[in-house]
């Protein structure tokens, strides 16, 4: 039975999803899914890992996010977070770009901060401009939440989405996690969809790859809520209902709504795209009148050539070859930006130096970005930028750590806060903190938590602790 999962969370839905993107892709392939969407909460953090794994496995990927609406404050420490959800799927690269823009806006607007994005539906619809497919959501979706107050409220919420995003861009989502009202709610939602000539789609709203991750998912929920598993008992599902399912399982689960299962394949085909097709858009470059970015870059490089190489014909030919490729690939603006940042640092007496494969570029050397002469040392430019590779150039520049903030603020001021970003690693659990949090979730005392976390540093606790965890709590007991 063909089926594509359009609602799936990875471990990048922090303390909510229990499987990494690669495991989700592998499981989707094992189940024979036609496509898999990654829709982590309020972020696109896992899409690169997802896309790379899916490409290696030949799986179609859909990129989206589940947006949190009406969140008054960060929801860690809350058993059942407040607010509603809006599931967004990007329709191709342009939809992806617009989704990234909306997510950025949500954290930069007044009141937005880590754990508390501020989304406004009117603004989201304006940003989307027809480039998103919007699902009404699972139990946290405004339409499904509206059913609690009756069909009129649910219908009002559905009409609002249709008015904002367009009838061709809204899908009614059916999910079944075996809650007492799920079957009835799905029937009502299907009736609403029919009444408004909308398609339904069936989803798992998956939070882990397989049933074996269920206990971990429950433990993560307890950690997020800062409660023990016993205290979370009323909020946790009775079994591994949020796992990826095959098309046959979904057809059986939604036997009264088989069209909702069938529709997922067409939606996946319409929204899937290769992440590599997305290219960064550089901020506009201010160059002197009468110049384009490439002509100004050639001018600056010519000045650098005279200072660094004089009339050396080998260097002149090398620079001409590099500049032709840079022009052909449309990267002149990138070199101008890096050159400008380095020039600022040097003018302020801030120590800086380019490194890595950029040292193989005579253009970088002529601009003063790097200090190694690639012509003298015979370094091949192709190591840095090649016509045979589709990847963008990557110039790494180290700045004096004590004055790095000055450079960052200069970049923000000149290019705009929304045109610059800092890259950071995602912090993951170390053994000591993992043991401490799991022990707390399992209801052990503070003293036991401390003792086990200390033992984890001695590298003796892993398997023993897991066995104790299993003996202490099981969702099936």
PLM features per residue range, with description:
Residues 1-457:
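Phosphodiester-processing cores and adjacent nucleic acid-binding clamps
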Residues 462-477:
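Positively charged, low-complexity/disordered segments
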């Amino acid at each position: 039975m063909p089926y594509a999962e359009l609602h799936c969370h990875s471990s990048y839905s922090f303390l909510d999803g229990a499987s990494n993107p690669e495991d989700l892709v592998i499981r989707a392939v094992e189940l024979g899914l036609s496509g898999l969407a990654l829709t982590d909460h309020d972020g696109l953090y896992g899409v690169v890992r997802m896309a790379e794994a899916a490409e290696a496995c030949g799986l179609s990927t859909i990129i989206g996010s589940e947006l949190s609406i009406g969140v008054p404050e960060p929801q860690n420490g809350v058993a059942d977070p407040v607010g509603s959800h809006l599931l967004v799927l990007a329709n191709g690269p342009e939809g992806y770009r617009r989704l990234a823009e909306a997510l950025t806006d949500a954290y930069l607007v007044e009141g937005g901060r880590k754990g508390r994005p501020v989304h406004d539906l009117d603004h989201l619809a304006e940003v989307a401009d027809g480039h998103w497919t919007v699902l009404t959501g699972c139990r946290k979706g405004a339409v499904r939440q509206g059913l609690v107050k009756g069909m009129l409220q649910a219908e009002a919420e559905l009409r609002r989405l249709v008015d904002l995003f367009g009838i061709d861009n809204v899908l009614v989502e059916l999910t079944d996690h075996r809650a007492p009202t799920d079957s009835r709610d799905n029937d009502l939602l299907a009736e609403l969809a029919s009444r408004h000539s909308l398609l339904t789609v069936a989803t798992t709203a998956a939070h882990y790859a397989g049933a074996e991750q269920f206990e971990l998912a429950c433990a993560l929920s307890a950690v997020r809520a800062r409660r023990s598993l016993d205290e979370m008992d009323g909020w946790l599902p009775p079994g591994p209902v949020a796992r990826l399912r095959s098309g046959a399982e979904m057809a059986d689960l939604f036997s009264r709504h088989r069209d909702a299962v069938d529709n997922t394949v067409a939606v996946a085909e319409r929204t899937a795209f290769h992440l590599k097709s997305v290219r960064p858009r550089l901020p506009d470059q201010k160059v002197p009148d009468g110049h384009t970015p490439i002509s100004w870059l050639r001018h600056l490089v010519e000045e650098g050539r005279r200072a660094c190489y004089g009339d050396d014909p080998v260097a002149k030919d090398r620079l001409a070859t590099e500049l032709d490729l840079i022009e052909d690939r449309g990267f002149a603006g990138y070199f101008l930006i890096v050159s400008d940042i380095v020039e600022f640092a040097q003018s302020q007496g801030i120590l800086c130096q380019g490194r890595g494969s950029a040292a193989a570029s005579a253009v970088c050397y002529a601009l003063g970005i790097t200090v190694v002469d690639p012509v003298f040392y015979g370094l091949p430019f192709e190591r840095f930028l090649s016509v045979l590779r589709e990847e963008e150039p990557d110039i790494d520049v180290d700045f004096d750590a004590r004055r790095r903030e000055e450079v960052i603020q200069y970049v923000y001021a000149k290019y705009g806060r929304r045109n610059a970003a800092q890259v950071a690693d995602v912090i993951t659990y170390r053994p000591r903190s993992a043991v401490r949090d799991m022990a707390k979730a399992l209801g052990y005392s503070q003293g036991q938590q401390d003792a086990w976390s200390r033992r984890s540093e001695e590298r003796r606790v892993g398997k023993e602790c897991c066995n104790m965890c299993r003996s202490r709590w099981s969702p099936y007991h």
